[in-house]
């Protein structure tokens, strides 16, 4: 009852005040499309930071007596609940862990910096503290300069400069727990002034907050709400940016149908978590604390759950037998086919799940997928509006230093254009109207994947005639809108991409100290388009970079219906966990459950011979893997990976390899590695069972090495290191090799075949050129011989007549 009363009081106190609307602050540094991960919390006691006497003055938040009393009552009740239940947890995050790439620096043109973070919906904040350190310019006037700290537009405190001591901190600010919502924004707003007249854009006036400043949050768990409609909660909360851990409980470590059902669930969770990443530890019993997902036939469920009455495919949420705050999701049925149906009920019917804690799932027909139709991939048969990729608000900027506007997009990486013809980016953007900024020095810079493409002035300065015509109402229409078409080189487009638009604004020179406008808006038109329609789907394999960036070639069909996973006959929990993590990676890549993938043991590979194969194995089962890698240049024996024997034609064949790959062809002695001690290998080659199909083998001495390899594959920071046909992972160190012959996946029209054959192969051009020369010489020799023979006959005939 005390807990219920506490919750009711907190809900009442929170409801009495409208949820604050967070202001939109620019990120401290444009850091790609990945949002900042929220790390695992460090549980420790909160310790106040004492401010020394020579540090800048701080101002504590003030509130009216009534609201302060209400807040104190809420906090007192929360503290009593903590003491009674002893379940309070203190989470300590540095600003760097919340997403700050470096110190949050503010100056004249960039006065606002902010960070976003989330509070899980099943947690209640009872107290919080912000501990800040940093520095402020000694040129600032203490009376009229300050950094104001707010949380969701609610005042927390103020930092004021001390010219004699530029650095400050650590300074501690208590935060009212009522200020917290599920999605929070912590803002630092800078107001500056100095003696005399100072141009705010010259960098003399500044303030910075260290990325090592800390936010301490104390939370208690709320009573669980077991409603299927809340999925993926409580297993995943979209407001929390940390990597997600979702335990799975399987009665049997290897059962193809149950593993297929589990893979569908893992890919759905991967689809929900997207960039955050997710891992699925596998257990045979329910964890003592927290949440878990149990998958299996009803008769084989853990005994701790009791006997569950099941009449068909069933989804059910029950309490963790060992933890009343934990929730166990049951995905079950009377047989294995019903378990698969139940998993599809989540994968394809999550939007229709009821508010109840139990549901009987009807059979679901999801239909067949077609190639390259993954929901996360942009179409390549038409121009795509930027407004289809991001909301309109993501294309709007404000002020002199608005930060980069990011438009992430994904595409199948096997794109090819005739003679490397570029793609088209049609950009429409709107500049501030009137004499607000110096348009001759202001521009829109456009890039892709951190590579500069083009810069356009915001607007050409008006001529004298234009100014006169504008004043009398005869000017050129809306010339604040510009339209440009720019090329995008095909080699700059990968599986995961990010278009960047940066408005570089220059202030107008004002006489004296007259301030110019500080609030104005720019935007990229949502009707701007990116056009990849001049491309074809064809590429040369193996290429592990395609796997790392887009799961290619397995994600050619979003449901992996042309792919199969090969596991050992008796995999342990770590191997199964690696399989689930890989399916989560596929779901995050395509945004679609892997309902079409088959799971087989090594004894049944021939049943899926016509599919692309993903093999996960340890050294104990490496004999089966060696047969599937017979078309590669690598062999596995006695726990070691080494280069296999190559024919005398290998050197000649290497002349016809792709020189633009960035990976050098290796000699037979270049690869010699043991796969023990945490070392793992990822090998890609053509399948010996079907021409044009791919085998991807993930190998290690134990299941832990396999699991680490999958986690490395899913981390975007490692994508540039994963290339070629072999990657060796020694912890976080990756080494790439290329040695195996290339093969072609995909087709092009007949008229493009010659260009494709010569593409990036100067050796082939030379050979074809030589053959052409030989052919021309042969034709000329034959023609000259015929001419000489005819001339000889003519001479003989003339002699006979004379």
Swiss-Prot record:
<comment type="pathway">
    <text>Glycan metabolism; bacterial cellulose biosynthesis.</text>
</comment>
<comment type="subunit">
    <text>Tightly associated with the cellulose synthase catalytic subunit.</text>
</comment>
<dbReference type="GO" id="GO:0005886">
    <property type="term" value="C:plasma membrane"/>
</dbReference>
<comment type="function">
    <text>Binds the cellulose synthase activator, bis-(3'-5') cyclic diguanylic acid (c-di-GMP).</text>
</comment>
<feature type="transmembrane region" description="Helical">
    <location>
        <begin position="765"/>
        <end position="785"/>
    </location>
</feature>
<feature type="region of interest" description="Disordered">
    <location>
        <begin position="23"/>
        <end position="64"/>
    </location>
</feature>
<dbReference type="InterPro" id="IPR018513">
    <property type="entry name" value="Cell_synthase_bac"/>
</dbReference>
<keyword id="KW-1003">Cell membrane</keyword>
<keyword id="KW-1133">Transmembrane helix</keyword>
<keyword id="KW-0135">Cellulose biosynthesis</keyword>
<keyword id="KW-0732">Signal</keyword>
<dbReference type="InterPro" id="IPR003920">
    <property type="entry name" value="Cell_synth_B"/>
</dbReference>
<feature type="topological domain" description="Cytoplasmic">
    <location>
        <begin position="786"/>
        <end position="802"/>
    </location>
</feature>
<keyword id="KW-0997">Cell inner membrane</keyword>
<protein>
    <recommendedName>
        <fullName>Cyclic di-GMP-binding protein</fullName>
    </recommendedName>
</protein>
<keyword id="KW-0472">Membrane</keyword>
<keyword id="KW-0812">Transmembrane</keyword>
<dbReference type="Pfam" id="PF03170">
    <property type="entry name" value="BcsB"/>
</dbReference>
<feature type="signal peptide">
    <location>
        <begin position="1"/>
        <end position="18"/>
    </location>
</feature>
<keyword id="KW-0973">c-di-GMP</keyword>
<feature type="topological domain" description="Periplasmic">
    <location>
        <begin position="19"/>
        <end position="764"/>
    </location>
</feature>
<comment type="similarity">
    <text>Belongs to the AcsB/BcsB family.</text>
</comment>
<dbReference type="GO" id="GO:0030244">
    <property type="term" value="P:cellulose biosynthetic process"/>
</dbReference>
<dbReference type="GO" id="GO:0006011">
    <property type="term" value="P:UDP-alpha-D-glucose metabolic process"/>
</dbReference>
């Amino acid at each position: 009852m005390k807990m219920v009363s506490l919750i009711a009081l907190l809900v009442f106190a929170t409801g009495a005040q409208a949820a604050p609307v967070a202001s939109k602050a620019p990120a401290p540094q444009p850091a790609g499309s990945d949002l900042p991960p929220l790390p695992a919390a460090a549980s420790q006691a909160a310790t106040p930071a004492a401010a020394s006497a020579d540090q800048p003055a701080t101002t504590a938040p003030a509130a009216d007596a009534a609201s302060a009393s209400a807040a104190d009552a809420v906090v007192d009740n929360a503290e009593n609940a903590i003491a009674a239940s002893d379940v309070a947890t203190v989470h300590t995050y540095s600003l760097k862990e919340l997403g700050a790439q470096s110190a949050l620096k503010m100056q004249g043109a960039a006065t606002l910096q902010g960070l976003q973070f989330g509070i899980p919906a099943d947690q209640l904040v009872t107290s919080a503290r912000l501990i800040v350190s940093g520095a402020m310019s000694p040129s600032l006037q203490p009376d009229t300069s300050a950094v104001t700290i707010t949380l969701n537009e609610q005042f927390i405190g103020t930092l004021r400069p001390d010219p004699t001591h530029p650095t400050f901190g650590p300074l501690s600010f208590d935060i009212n727990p009522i200020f917290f919502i599920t999605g929070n924004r912590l803002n630092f707003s800078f107001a500056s002034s100095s003696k005399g007249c100072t141009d705010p854009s010259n960098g003399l006036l500044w303030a910075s907050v260290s990325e090592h400043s800390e936010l301490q949050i104390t939370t208690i768990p709320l009573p669980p709400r077991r409603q299927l409609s809340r999925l993926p909660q409580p297993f995943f909360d979209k407001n929390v940016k940390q990597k997600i851990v979702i335990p799975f409980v399987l009665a049997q470590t290897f059962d193809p149908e149950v593993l297929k059902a589990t893979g569908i669930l893992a890919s759905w969770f991967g689809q929900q978590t997207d960039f955050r990443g997710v891992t699925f530890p596998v257990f045979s019993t329910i964890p003592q604390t927290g949440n878990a997902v149990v998958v299996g036939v009803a008769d084989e469920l853990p005994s701790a759950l009791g006997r569950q009455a099941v009449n068909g495919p069933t989804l059910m949420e029950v309490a963790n037998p060992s933890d009343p705050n934990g929730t166990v999701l049951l995905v079950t049925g009377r047989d294995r086919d019903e378990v698969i149906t139940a998993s599809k009920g989540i994968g394809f019917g999550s939007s229709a799940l009821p508010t109840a804690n139990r549901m009987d799932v009807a059979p679901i027909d999801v239909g067949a997928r077609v190639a390259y139709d993954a929901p996360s991939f942009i179409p390549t048969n038409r121009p795509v509006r930027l407004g289809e990729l991001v909301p309109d608000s993501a294309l709007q900027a404000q002020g002199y230093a608005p930060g980069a506007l990011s438009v992430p997009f994904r595409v199948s990486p096997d794109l090819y254009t005739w003679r490397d013809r570029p793609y088209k980016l049609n950009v429409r953007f709107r500049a501030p109207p009137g004499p607000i900024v110096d348009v001759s020095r202001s521009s829109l810079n456009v890039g892709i994947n951190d590579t500069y493409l083009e810069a356009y002035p915001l607007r050409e300065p008006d001529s004298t005639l234009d100014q006169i015509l504008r004043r009398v109402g005869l000017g050129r229409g809306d010339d604040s809108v510009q339209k440009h078409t720019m090329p995008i080189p095909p080699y700059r487009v990968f599986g995961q991409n990010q278009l960047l638009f940066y408005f570089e604004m220059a202030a107008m020179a004002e006489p004296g100290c007259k301030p110019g406008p500080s609030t104005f808006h720019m935007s990229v038109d949502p009707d701007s388009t990116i056009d990849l329609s001049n491309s074809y789907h064809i590429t040369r394999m193996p290429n592990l970079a395609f796997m790392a960036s887009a799961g290619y070639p397995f994600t050619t069909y979003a449901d992996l219906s042309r792919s199969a996973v090969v596991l050992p006959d008796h995999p342990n929990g770590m191997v199964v966990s690696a399989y689930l993590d890989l399916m989560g990676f596929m779901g995050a890549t395509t945004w679609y459950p892997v309902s079409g993938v088959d799971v087989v043991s090594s004894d049944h590979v021939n049943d899926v011979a016509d599919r692309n194969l993903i093999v996960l194995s340890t050294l104990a089962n490496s004999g089966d893997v060696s047969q599937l890698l017979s078309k590669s240049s690598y062999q596995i024996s006695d726990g070691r990976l080494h280069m296999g024997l190559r024919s005398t034609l290998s050197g000649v064949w290497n002349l016809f390899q792709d020189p633009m790959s960035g990976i050098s062809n290796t000699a037979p002695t270049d690869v010699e590695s043991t796969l023990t001690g945490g070392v793992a290998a990822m090998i890609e080659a053509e399948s010996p069972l079907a021409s044009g199909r791919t085998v991807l083998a993930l190998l290690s001495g134990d299941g832990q090495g396999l699991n680490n390899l999958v986690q490395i594959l899913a981390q975007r920071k490692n994508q540039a290191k994963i290339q070629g046909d072999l990657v060796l992972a020694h912890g976080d160190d990756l080494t790439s090799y290329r040695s195996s012959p290339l093969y072609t996946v995909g087709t092009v029209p007949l008229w493009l075949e010659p260009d494709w054959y010569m593409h990036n192969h100067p050796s082939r051009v030379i050979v074809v050129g030589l053959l052409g020369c030989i052919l021309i010489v042969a034709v000329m020799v034959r023609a000259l011989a015929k001419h000489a023979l005819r001339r000889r006959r003519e001479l003989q005939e003339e002699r006979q007549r004379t």
